[in-house]
Amino acid sequence: VTEEITYFYQNFDESRVDKLVYDFYKYPKIAIFGILNSDNGAKELQYNLIGWGKICISYTNFQDQLDFIKSADSNTLIVIFSFSGNYVMKNGYSRFYHTYDYLKSSKAKVYVITKNNLVQELEYVNEVILVPIKHDLYNYTLQCLVDLIFMKYQKNLIK
């Protein structure tokens, strides 16, 4: 576990988190989504931000998430936790739920937090936060990332 966390901090580009935190202040509507294990990170970040007065939308039901994405406007920031990248890939969940079509037509700014390098190539994803993982102990890495995002948000709020 220690090796995984050390690897994360030594190889992670924090400037991507700085952009995300900036956008938390910029956008009036924020949604944070994920499914399965990635939903844990989404929920944790949402709870932390709400505790500091930043209201964020989050749905556990995947279809509710897709409906939100489909109707999001340009004043909306969507953060998707998907360690595998399947949430946003054309060959992933899109086969069944048309996520590709919804994301491609969305007017929202979309961030994806993932370990999948291929997500960077998707034109309908505006920003990618790549998470370095060494041994697939991503639950620990996910917690470190959520804590880092929240600490940077707190730090900017206090200034």
Q: What function would you assign to each model-found segment?
A:
Residues 25-158:
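Glycine-rich phosphate-binding loops that contact phosphosugars or nucleotide phosphates
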Residues 16, 21, 157-159:
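Active-site phosphate/pyrophosphate-binding segments
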Residues 1-16:
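HTH-adjacent hinge/linker in prokaryotic transcriptional regulators
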Residues 11, 23-26:
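Membrane-interface junctions
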